[in-house]
Amino acid sequence: MNDTYELHISGLTRNLKKVRVADDLVIASFVMLGDTELIERTAEDLYRKLPDGIDYLVCPEAKGIPLTHAIARRLGINYVIVRKSVKGYMENPVIEKVQSITTREPQIIVLDGLDAQKL
């Protein structure tokens, strides 16, 4: 098995490390945090493909935040972050159980009730 996967996106190339996340599953680990060039280029490409009339963007914490922020800035709108745990500041949080391919145990995702009202 090759140790990396060559990703071509928005005119850029990145070599992603392959990681075994289960006995029968290997994924190419894609972490864009800190890759300003990749975030800005993909944000511009995605922005151009989005329809008019979007009110909010929603993203999971934390890896998607920079890309979502860059797209929202271009759209001139705000965005909402779905958290991985209930935070003390949340009002009437909306909690959903999920199963990720990168973790063995079930997790929860949490949307602040105030953000849920916006959406």
Roles of regions detected by a PLM:
Residues 66-75:
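Short Gly/Thr/Asp-enriched flexible loops that form oxyanion-binding sites at enzyme active sites
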Residues 77-119:
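Short, glycine/charge-rich flexible loops or terminal/linker lids adjacent to PRPP-binding catalytic cores
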Residues 43-46, 66-67, 107-114:
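A generic local structural motif
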Residues 34-38, 58, 100-104:
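Short, flexible loop segments at the rims of nucleotide/cofactor-binding pockets, characterized by
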